[in-house]
Amino acid sequence: KTVISQKSGAKNIIKKYKEASTGKSPIDKTCPIWICWWQGEANMPDIVKVCYASAKHHAGQHPVILITEQNYQEYATMPDYILQKVKNHEISLTHFSDMLRINLLKEHGGIWADSTLLFTRDVDSIMNPDTDFYTCHHTAKNTNVANGKWTVFFIACGKDNILPAFLLDMFYSYWKNHQQIVTYLFFDYLVSIAYENIPAITEMVDSVPLQRISNLSKCLNMPFNEKSMEEFSA
């Protein structure tokens, strides 16, 4: 974390946001749900197709916007040096998608959901759209950077929220001066730096209620069992 802070120029960025407020723009019942599959819907594998369909089925009044290689520039403006490093394979598509989701949330607000999330109930029954921030605050089954306080695969906030603003500054500062990532969990470490140093972000993250989440990946090679599915969906 210390190395990431130094390489990202965290000291000056933290100073910029230290006394900032969260910005109380609500998530809203009609904000977009952002899902990314770079190759487009026609090239989704079966699991992603099912998850994407579940998001649309449970979206309520939220428009579901699929971000692809062909349309992402309609919604997000990225610095030329970032796009060049993606083209040169210095930034992987995985880490580019980290910046893309933060860019979308900062500029438009909304809900980011990874393409392999299966929705089993309506989005607005999972979170309160009148709040300004939501993520999956859960009891961690193992020790990691987030320790259950957040997940980067599901984040929701209103437009111009302080967290994506801080994270985007950190991402851009890092990649302006470096050609490779220092750890796969770079995104989580940036959130951790924000959580530990920006009081408004600490308060915002801590305000999210505890949520039960289920990991279906361990069941991928097992026959479908309706009872087990009901338990996962409870």
Predicted regions: what they are:
Residues 108, 113-115:
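Active-site acidic Asp-centered loop
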